[in-house]
């Protein structure tokens, strides 16, 4: 992936820049926008460029389609023999990035599961479509949400509600996420991006 100025188009995402607002869209709808290493590294480069661009003020991260924000790690890619590599700054270049100076808004347009939920939790604000839902299903398959879910969720909603989600893997709809405190606003799906831009 090269700087946007070099006009090379990203393969697994898109970037639309308007008035200092970067709209970054994960584009793997056939895999529920799950991220394999090439997509993760591409997003990490996009967010590095966003950080370095003095004209960039805020980024909005969303997923293509209405079904999924991001289903997390692309397990099928791993099952098919793909190497597991993660950018130094974590999933999408966000989950292990503690030096950000500009806000990133997650516009969650559908399911945000596992690493996808962890990416949303790493953003500064979460605006969710009414039909969006969230979960950390790792415990059900003997894994742990080590890309930030285990420490960000308890900090954002308190220990007991967070453990309830982490240990059971249960899914939480957008309106419950708002009540619990990790979602900032719930809006009708068609209004999601406009609301995030405001």
Predicted regions located by residue number:
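Conserved CoA-thioester-binding segment of acyl-CoA-metabolizing enzymes
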Residues: 1-66
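Crotonase-fold acyl-CoA enzyme core
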Residues: 98-198
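Hydrophobic/aromatic residues within transmembrane alpha-helices
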Residues: 24, 61, 74, 119-121, ...
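Amphipathic alpha-helical interaction surfaces in cytosolic regulatory modules
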Residues: 66-75
